[in-house]
């Protein structure tokens, strides 16, 4: 019997395909050339993997490895192929555990436990096996199983962190991916075969290795590896502290919440952060010649609360801190430059009156009395309201702004008078041993919650603006992070369980017809891994209060 023919609109052209054909076959037969490979499709606005089959008339859009979602799928697929190749080379009996930790440069840092020796020769063999799997276009399968069956499967394969994670999942089904004999669970979509996995490298690093990956803008080139040792060691230290509390993965956190509650974890985390801030203040004071504390970090890092808490610690050490916001040195709005999209660019250095900033700061350093400006965000004008300042022996300026680590901002100030601090929310928790939590996700959820509370901004608006925020960070903050004298991790191991309560209603408010719905759906799925906790026990000086409300600081 002939199969029913269905209408499929691709790039404005209506085509006919038989019901049940795979999207892979449609892509291959379309004759449409794309700059980079098609890895997923959008079917009536919904993402679908290429092994899925056509069920009804639809509009079809191709998602390539150069698209954000497509590139994330590519990276996830490389990780799956890597894991299979490790077991191929070492033998399953010689590998107890392979763990993904955090991003390093353009790649991911992994460690491995077991009898297999981790050296460059081993990595070269793994790399060769990955290319073999890719050259053979080894299929990547997907099947849906009952949650109980998935838990048993994870136990059988000694994936105990996944086993613990799914004990707390409310879903009845779990998607399991496989490449040959190797089964695993991944949070997110996957390629339909290993043939995509062409561009990567493996390099020994610290106690493990780095899986090097391309950049999305050029997905066929591996950029040179530049170790970021300072931020790496901050992440490693945070992870080690989490491990000391027996909370490395989301399942561990959920287990702790259900058995003991969160109070002790909360108090220990807050104490660790306070000790870190105190150490930073002690170092600043002990160096003796610092007058300008330059604080920078990406969006929603908790810079404002951190500045307040550092100021308190500096005061406790006998100093007299004065906050200075670089935003007060914005040029008048009519003089703000435009970005490549024709929009006002408030995040570039050129939006700041750098000359006036240096003139004022140098005058303060020389003991002069200076009237400081205040930027009026309603009128878009810089104003002077009689705010005078003169620095004495114990006075010190705490300067917060995204360009704080860039010496072009403070070019006239002597290097020895500056102390640079980089702050970011470097998530120390992962979903499980093979599914990391990107630090950007934690910051985006923080921002969604804060902006809704303080600015009345919808989650839809925050998500829509996020790519622009990220571009500003890539250009103005991340290139200078290793210039910092010290780094501070503002992430709290329990925070996503708390933020969930505030973020979920905001994300559910995004309609399915909106372009931001896909990201909202992804974040909701992510938050569903966590058991929620109330915010009542969070101290009022906590960095997290900057986002959920109730801070004792003016944030």
Please state what every model-predicted region is:
Residues 317-334:
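Short beta-strand-centered segment that lines the nucleotide-binding/catalytic pocket of NTP-utilizing
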Residues 331, 335-378:
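Conserved nucleotide-sensing/catalytic segment adjacent to the nucleotide-binding pocket
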Residues 52-73, 85, 94-105, 109-275, ...:
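Auxiliary tRNA-acceptor-end handling modules of aminoacyl-tRNA synthetases
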Residues 293-295:
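Hydrophobic anchor at the beta1->P-loop junction of P-loop NTPases
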Residues 288, 411-555:
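Conserved NTP phosphate-binding and transfer environment spanning the P-loop NTPase/kinase superfamily
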Residues 303:
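Conserved lysine of the Walker
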Residues 358-416, 466-480:
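Glycine-rich phosphate-binding loop used to anchor ATP phosphates in small-molecule kinases
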Residues 306, 310:
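Hydrophobic positions on the alpha1 helix immediately C-terminal to the Walker A/P-loop
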């Amino acid at each position: 019997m002939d199969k029913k023919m269905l209408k499929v609109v691709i790039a404005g052209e209506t085509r006919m395909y038989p019901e049940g054909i795979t999207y892979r076959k449609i892509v291959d037969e379309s004759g449409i050339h794309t700059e980079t490979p098609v890895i997923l499709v959008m079917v009536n606005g919904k993402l679908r993997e290429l092994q899925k089959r056509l069920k009804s008339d639809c509009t079809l859009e191709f998602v390539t490895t150069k698209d954000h979602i497509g590139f994330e799928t590519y990276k996830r697929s490389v990780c799956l192929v890597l894991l299979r190749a490790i077991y191929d080379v070492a033998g399953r009996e010689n590998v107890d555990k392979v763990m993904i930790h955090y991003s390093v440069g353009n790649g991911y840092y992994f460690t491995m436990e077991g009898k297999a020796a981790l050296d460059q020769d081993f990595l070269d063999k793994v790399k060769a096996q990955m290319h073999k799997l890719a050259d053979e276009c080894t299929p990547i399968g997907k099947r849906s199983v009952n949650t109980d069956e998935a838990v048993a499967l994870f136990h059988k394969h000694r994936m105990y962190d996944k086993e613990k994670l799914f004990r707390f999942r409310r879903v009845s089904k779990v998607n399991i991916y496989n490449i040959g004999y190797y089964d695993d669970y991944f949070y997110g979509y996957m390629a339909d075969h290993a043939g995509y996995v062409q561009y990567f490298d493996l390099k020994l690093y610290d106690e493990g290795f780095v899986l090097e990956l391309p950049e999305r803008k050029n997905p066929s080139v591996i950029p040179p590896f530049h170790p970021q040792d300072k931020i790496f060691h901050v992440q490693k230290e945070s992870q080690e502290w989490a491990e000391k509390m027996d909370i490395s993965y989301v399942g561990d956190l959920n287990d702790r919440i259900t058995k003991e509650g969160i109070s002790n974890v909360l108090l220990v985390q807050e104490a660790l952060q306070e000790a870190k801030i105190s150490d930073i203040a002690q170092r600043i004071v002990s160096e003796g010649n610092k007058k300008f504390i330059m604080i920078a970090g990406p969006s929603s890092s908790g810079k404002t609360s951190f500045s307040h808490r550092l100021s308190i610690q500096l005061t406790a050490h006998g100093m007299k801190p004065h906050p200075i916001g670089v935003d007060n040195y914005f040029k008048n709005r009519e003089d703000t430059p435009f970005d490549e999209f024709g929009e006002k660019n408030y995040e570039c250095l050129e939006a700041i009156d750098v000359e006036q900033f240096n003139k004022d700061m140098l005058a303060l350093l020389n003991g002069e009395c200076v009237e400081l400006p205040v930027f009026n965000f309603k009128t878009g004008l810089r104003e002077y309201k009689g705010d005078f300042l003169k620095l004495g022996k114990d006075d010190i300026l705490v300067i917060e702004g995204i360009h704080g680590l860039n010496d072009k901002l403070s070019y006239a100030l002597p290097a020895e008078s500056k102390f640079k601090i980089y702050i970011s929310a470097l998530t120390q928790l992962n979903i499980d041993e093979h599914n990391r939590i990107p630090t950007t996700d934690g910051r985006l959820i923080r921002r969604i919650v804060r902006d809704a509370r303080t600015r009345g901004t919808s989650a839809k608006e925050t998500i829509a603006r996020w790519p622009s925020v990220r571009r500003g960070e890539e250009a103005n903050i991340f290139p200078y992070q290793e210039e910092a004298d010290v780094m501070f991790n503002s992430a709290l191991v329990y925070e996503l369980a708390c933020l969930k309560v505030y973020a979920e209603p905001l994300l559910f408010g995004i309609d399915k017809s909106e372009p931001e719905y896909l990201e909202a759906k992804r974040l909701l799925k992510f938050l569903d891994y966590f058991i929620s906790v109330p915010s009542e026990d969070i101290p009022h000086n906590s960095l997290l209060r900057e986002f959920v409300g109730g801070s004792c600081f003016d944030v």
